[in-house]
Amino acid sequence: MSTAVSLPPGQGIYLLIATLPLLVISEFRSTSYVGICLFKMLSSVAFLSGPLLQASTNDSPYCRLITAGLLFSLLGDFFLLPSRGDFSTRDSTKERKISVSFQLGVVAFAAAHIAYVFAFLSDSRETSRELLATTFIATMVLAKWLGVVYPPSHSSASSNALDLAISPDMKPLVFVYALIISSMFAVAVSTVPSSLSTVSPYQRSLGAAMFVASDLFVAKDAFGRSSAPNQRGWFRIAVGYGLYFWGQMVIAGTVGA
């Protein structure tokens, strides 16, 4: 049984190592709209490149579904890019409106999680239903406590810990997204890969957990009451992006492992 994390072949890893720091710098300084867009999309291409290269020799349902999930994620990254108008007012203290593009990004990422769910189930030697149910419920309870699911108007130690203010029209979409991402994480934790000789049994869980954690940073940035970009330090930006892009790379590494 392998205990090491397997990363995808090809130059994607080196591309991500090069572009991710540049994305963090561009985001932190907020001086280059082109830089943010360019380095974010290149970082997305990095985690997708490995599975795409393997697609010609690996035609398994697992490979196709993971690749589809990564493609949906790249599409989500594109939709979440700020418009030039949003970029020019990103340091404003005015309340920010959630754009149609952002909503499309949420839908794209939901599709990515659904693809991962089917991928994990398609390549599982066993599934623990008890662990599946427990993980799903625990994740939804955590989402409610953090304020992702129908948050109250005020933050407290027992509810809405992230101090989120989600508009009424966005609450149903965010709730459905929370259901889907909780399902993805629960399936990742409760399934065992068919091939344990080449991939760690915990690699799916690790990648899924990193993806889930990165979404909390997105939620805080999009819906937090005190989440203006100029109030985010470089460390917070680096952790959020690092969890997301390297989490996707970890998931991509399970293809052909």
Task: Please give the residue ranges for each predicted region.
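Polytopic alpha-helical membrane-helix bundles and their juxtamembrane interface segments
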Residues: 1-257
